[in-house]
């Protein structure tokens, strides 16, 4: 079994499922008392979020690249960045850390393609929904077209993520709002929905979505397990 290095804490609420899902995956594959060989570097999300708001992406890239190097020195054999949004600086991490980097959009793209879909809704932070680092990769590498919410909906979802979910607050009102947005995007032709923020899967259960759900945290964790046992 390879040792996986997790870059977490963005937010820590969604890092917990990564640890659980990876361990469950190893147990299912190997049985008995087997558990995952995991190293975790959990950053202070306050600093990361401030950099996001200020547009200081180079600084966040430096922080995460240094964290990845620390995991490499500690014995990690691959890197999993436990957040969708911070894949905006994936290149900065990969340019300085020589370990295999398991990109969350690639794992998600393979899952969508495997389900025979080419047109999906995307919910996430405004950075993930509006910028090209995530949607563009899905389009270029997997020919997947992402439908995103309207501007006011994007602002509301971003507010829910940062002011509620990242603080461990999960309300029925926000759950219903996200389900309503998903239903509207289904009417526009979306075949499935990407929970492109690792916290959204903590808010909206699959049964509340009219579309098949691609929970990126779960998909990414499965990809990590496959890598660890390869």
Curated annotation (Swiss-Prot):
It catalyses: an L-alpha-amino acid = a D-alpha-amino acid; L-homoserine = D-homoserine. Its EC number is 5.1.1.10. The active site is at residues 83, 197. Gene3D superfamilies: 3.40.50.1860. Optimum temperature is 37 degrees Celsius. InterPro entries: Asp/Glu/hydantoin_racemase (IPR015942), Asp/Glu_race (IPR001920), Asp/Glu_racemase_AS_1 (IPR018187), Asp/Glu_racemase_AS_2 (IPR033134), Asp_race (IPR004380). Optimum pH is 8.5 with L-homoserine as substrate. The keyword Isomerase applies. Keywords: Isomerase. Substrate binds at residues 10, 52, 83-85, 198-199. GO terms for molecular function: amino-acid racemase activity. Belongs to the aspartate/glutamate racemases family. Amino-acid racemase able to utilize a broad range of substrates. Highest activity is observed with L-homoserine and D-homoserine. Has tenfold lower activity against L-methionine, L-leucine, L-valine and L-histidine. Has low activity with L-norvaline, L-asparagine, D-methionine, L-aminobutyric acid, L-isoleucine, L-serine, L-norleucine, L-alanine, L-glutamine, LL-diaminopimelic acid and L-phenylalanine. Has no activity against ten L-amino acids (Thr, Glu, Asp, Arg, Lys, Tyr, Trp, Orn, Cit and Aad). This is Broad specificity amino-acid racemase YgeA.
């Amino acid at each position: 079994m390879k040792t996986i290095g997790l870059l977490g804490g963005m937010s820590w609420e969604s890092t917990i499922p990564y640890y659980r899902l990876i361990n469950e995956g190893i147990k299912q594959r190997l049985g008995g008392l087997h558990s995952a060989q995991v190293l975790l570097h959990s950053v202070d999300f306050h600093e990361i979020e401030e950099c996001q708001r200020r547009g200081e992406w180079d600084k966040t890239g430096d922080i995460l690249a240094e964290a990845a190097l620390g995991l490499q020195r500690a014995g990690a054999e691959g890197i999993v960045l436990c957040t969708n949004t911070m894949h905006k600086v994936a290149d900065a991490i990969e340019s300085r850390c020589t370990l295999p980097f398991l990109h969350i959009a690639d794992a998600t793209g393979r899952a969508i393609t495997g389900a025979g879909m080419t047109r999906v809704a995307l919910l996430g932070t405004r950075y993930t929904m509006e910028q090209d680092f995530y949607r563009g990769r899905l389009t270029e590498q997997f020919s997947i077209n992402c439908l995103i919410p309207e501007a006011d909906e994007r602002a509301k979802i971003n507010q829910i993520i940062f002011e509620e979910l990242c603080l461990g607050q999960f309300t029925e009102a926000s759950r219903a709002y996200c389900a309503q947005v998903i239903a509207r995007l289904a009417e526009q032709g979306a075949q499935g929905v990407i929970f492109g923020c690792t916290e959204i899967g903590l808010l909206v259960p699959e049964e509340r979505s009219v579309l098949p759900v691609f929970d990126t945290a779960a998909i990414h964790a499965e990809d990590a397990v496959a890598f660890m046992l390869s």
